[in-house]
A protein has these predicted regions:
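N-terminal active-site beta-alpha-beta segment that forms phosphate/nucleotide-binding
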Residues: 2-87
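Conserved phosphate- and dinucleotide-binding cores of soluble alpha/beta proteins
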Residues: 81-200
């Protein structure tokens, strides 16, 4: 993976970029950087593999649908939307530096766009694709079906596990699309690239 070229393109698009050899070193970096803050986390296999909730919740107030006890999903999502820091993995990233996420309820794609002091976007090497079309294809036809299956959805993509069927199922999880061509105004963004396969 040519992270040098990708880093250069992301920086040209206005993003701060950090590159790590493995998930452990990336998690240690984030654990050092984020301290004494309110932190929102989108649902993410990548971040679960990095054990970020456990690490960060030791010295931050963390809101994560997958991990925060004692609150409803809706309460957690609202608190995550207004947290100082927001963390999300990416479903796809092009070599040109375009960042793609697909969402079912919209909590993650909306939180990425606005409302925080800083947003960290995390991607393993498997999320990188040649161009925008390939990154979008990856998000819809690889990440989407695998996530639907993980969540126990009864959608065609989860059952067959091979591609997006653009279905009308009430359990469909790909309902909203976020594409960041350039760094949005209003807050700081950092893309965390990890030279390991992580998540879907």
């Amino acid at each position: 993976m040519d992270f040098i070229k990708l880093k250069k393109n992301l920086e040209k698009n206005g993003f701060k970029v950090s590159v790590f050899e493995n998930a452990c070193s990336a998690a240690e970096y984030l654990d050092r950087e984020i301290d004494g803050m309110t932190v929102g986390m989108g649902g993410s296999v990548t971040m679960k593999q990095m054990d970020l909730y456990r690490k960060l919740s030791a010295h931050n107030d963390v809101f994560s649908n997958a991990d925060t006890p004692g609150k409803t999903r809706e309460e957690i999502s609202r608190e995550a939307q207004t947290a100082d820091i927001y963390l999300s993995s990416l479903n796809g990233i092009s070599e040109n530096g375009e960042l793609i996420n697909i969402d079912g309820t919209g909590n993650r794609v909306s939180a990425i766009q606005y409302g925080h002091k800083k947003v960290y976007l995390i991607a393993g090497s498997n999320k990188v694709a040649k161009d925008y079309e390939a990154a979008l294809y990856r998000a819809r036809n690889i990440a989407g079906p695998l996530n639907a299956k993980r969540l126990g959805k009864k959608t065609p993509c989860a059952v067959k596990g091979d591609k997006c069927y653009d279905c009308n199922s009430p359990e469909r999880i790909c309902r909203g699309l976020s594409v960041l061509w350039k760094k949005p105004g209003g807050c700081e963004y950092e893309v965390v690239l990890i030279d390991e396969e992580l998540g879907y």
